[in-house]
Amino acid sequence: MLAPSQVSLADLPRLHKGDRPQAEFKQTPEDFQVIEQLDVIDDGEGEHQWLWVRKTGANTNFCAEKIARFAGVSERNVSYSGLKDRQAVTWQWFSIQLPGKETLNWNELNDEEMSVERIIRRTKKLKTGFHRANRFVIRLANVSSREALENLWQGVSEQGVINYFGEQRFGRSGDNVAQAERWLMASRPPRISRSKRSLYLSALRSYLFNEIVAERIRQFGIEGTLTGDCVMLEGSQSVFTVEQWDDELKQRLANNNIYLTAPLAGSTNKPLVKGEADAFEQSLLQPFDSWLQALRKLRVEAARRTILLRVENPEISWQGKDAELRFTLPSGAYATTVLNEIVDLSGESR
């Protein structure tokens, strides 16, 4: 089983230097707010009823189950774009397929944990990963040094952070990774739900990504290049292989027109890294060959993820020793990776 430190962001290299101030976080759900950024149009008709839901201290799956029970259908009929934190106040869209039915009185679902704030009808369901970003509002209490936090926040605002997967991806003390490994390595893997399977596979791929990125930062820094690197274009998922770095490509990298990437392990017919970059990644993946074989057997498609994460529309305000941070991250990015760069939350719940 993996030691807890192996999935802890605290043990991974940071982009910004300097001592981080201490602070208190998540004393209440209101200290961590997440607003899904998704532009939708009300079609006025259709068999898919979309719900804009505010939830407090409840996870996304809990709300999906509650919606399904209320409508008297299988949870498979309920869709959402992404999972949101439990220990938080969050806003996100759900859709539920109810062919031939009038709009239900969804307000009957409202309670302290969940509130339906908007209802629309659409001809299409909400697909996973459909939202473009999340807006975060984070409150830090009793910050030990305003100057230290301001300096680190300026660095994050200008340069971004390392795009690690957050610790919540791995469960308590890395339990998701350990359980996923036991499941994959079993002579006869037990049948598990689709959601648990997705959770397990995501935990393994995220762990490998963090390991590769951390070692790359240790050896080469955030802008260190290797022949055969796979880079991603700004504002898209389009990637290409750099056969040889020249001055123009290095300038595009410095200007954040392109980004270095690391692998999300899986099956691929067309390797996207070559030469030095491929040799570096394979040297780190080799000890996990049994994981890689299992991912390929399960036909998990390989992908790439940027190493650098840019923070959009960053803001900071103060009330005494308490700071409020506001910023936007693309879907799939973690606010905890931003916090890890600027504040020491030792002993605090994440």
UniProtKB/Swiss-Prot annotation:
The active site is at D85. PROSITE patterns: TRUD, UPF0024. Residues 160-310 form the TRUD domain. GO terms for biological process: tRNA pseudouridine synthesis. InterPro entries: PsdUridine_synth_cat_dom_sf, PsdUridine_synth_TruD, PsdUridine_synth_TruD_CS, PsdUridine_synth_TruD_insert, TruD_catalytic, TruD_insert_sf, TruD_pseudoU_synthase. One of its GO terms (molecular function) is tRNA pseudouridine(13) synthase activity. The keyword Isomerase applies. Keywords: Isomerase, tRNA processing. Pfam families: TruD. GO terms for cellular component: cytosol. It catalyses: uridine(13) in tRNA = pseudouridine(13) in tRNA. Its EC number is 5.4.99.27. The keyword Ribonucleoprotein does not apply. It is an enzyme of class 5 (isomerase). Belongs to the pseudouridine synthase TruD family. Responsible for synthesis of pseudouridine from uracil-13 in transfer RNAs. HAMAP family: TruD (MF_01082). This is tRNA pseudouridine synthase D. It comes from Idiomarina loihiensis (strain ATCC BAA-735 / DSM 15497 / L2-TR).
